[in-house]
Regions:
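GST-like domain detector, emphasizing the conserved glutathione-binding G-site
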Residues: 1-196
Length: 196
């Protein structure tokens, strides 16, 4: 899957970190390299759950809002298909189609983490959106997303998924030997240039 062009206005995702259906949508966003504003909606949350209900008509997650096409939608399969069709200009690849064992695998991961990221904890709201550079399958980023969800802290998710074989493995122990070189023109190259 090649990275999509960023839309003029950021996508908005009302999401629960521990939900396997939300995970499918975040995986599609990572695959396409799309940034999104994430509005965490943990159980017992008060900050964005009512806003999501007002926008979509029900308290169900994931909820995607695309201001570029005036689209508001529920259901992970529909959202994933929409993202690949609209921004990837392609059919949803087999590896990203929800169904089969995908929800079970996502739910198992949440259970192993004792459903962290699913229940609200009190926190002060930030004055502006926080920003997170991450990718869905990163175990390090998951810890951060879990806490952001629990604290109902909205953030801009900048997806910097793996773009080449040299990106595989933890930063200190990559699969490919030698000095790390990000893919020329890729998102990881941009992040390294900006933040070092």
């Amino acid at each position: 899957v090649k990275a999509a062009r960023q839309p003029e206005k950021r996508l908005k995702l009302y999401d629960m970190e521990s939900c396997p259906f939300c995970k499918s949508v975040r995986e599609a966003l990572t695959a396409l390299g799309l940034d999104a504003e994430i509005y965490p909606c943990p159980r017992g949350g008060k900050r964005f759950r009512q806003e999501a209900k007002r926008i979509g008509g029900k308290e169900q997650f994931p909820l995607l809002v695309d201001p570029n096409h005036q689209v508001t939608m529920y259901e992970s399969k529909a959202i994933v298909d929409y993202l690949f069709r609209t921004y990837g200009e392609m059919k949803t690849p087999a590896g990203y189609r929800p169904g089969g064992l995908r929800p079970l695998a996502g739910a198992t991961g949440a259970l192993l983490r004792l459903r962290r990221g699913s229940a609200v904890r009190a926190a002060e709201a930030p004055k502006q959106l926080l920003e997170l550079w991450s990718f869905e399958s990163s175990p390090y980023s998951r810890l951060v997303r879990e806490r952001l969800t629990e604290l109902e802290l909205p953030y801009i998710l900048h997806n910097i998924g793996k773009e080449q074989f040299a990106d595989m493995g933890p930063a200190a122990m990559r699969v490919k030997p030698g000095p790390y070189k990000p893919k020329a023109g890729g998102r990881r190259e941009q992040v390294l240039a900006k933040f070092g």
